[in-house]
Swiss-Prot record:
One of several proteins that assist in the late maturation steps of the functional core of the 30S ribosomal subunit. Associates with free 30S ribosomal subunits (but not with 30S subunits that are part of 70S ribosomes or polysomes). Required for efficient processing of 16S rRNA. May interact with the 5'-terminal helix region of 16S rRNA. This is Ribosome-binding factor A. One of its GO terms (molecular function) is ribosomal small subunit binding. The lineage of its organism: Bacteria, Bacillati, Cyanobacteriota, Cyanophyceae, Synechococcales. It comes from the Bacteria. HAMAP family: RbfA. SUPFAM superfamilies: Ribosome-binding factor A, RbfA. Keywords: Cytoplasm, Ribosome biogenesis. The gene is rbfA.
Amino acid sequence: MAQSRRVEKVAALIRKEMSELLSNGIRDQRVNTTMITITEVEVSGDLQHCKIFVSIYGNEIQKDEVFSGLEASQSFLKGELGRRLQMRRAPEVVFKLDRGMEKGISVLNLLEKLEAERNIKDKKLIEFQE
């Protein structure tokens, strides 16, 4: 259980430091063009691997461009994390694109469409009965 708490604390620290680095530390213009949100950080039990899930605001072209900038900055970010967290070995950083918000919005749109279709059917049924 203690190891689990340690992993959670390290994940929280990585999230905090990575947020700071993404907003102020990267000079790559591709990364600075739009808003990036860190949605989740997963750290392995041995603290050697770190998956950072990001949500990127913008269209698909912008997202691809920003994501390629993040991937190009991985080694720099790993070094900065190691310095800031003062860890013996900084974890390998891997970025993953989180499409949860997009999927949630598409589900909501489908539900709204179904509700509209149902309302139309109910309205036609009421008109038919009159």
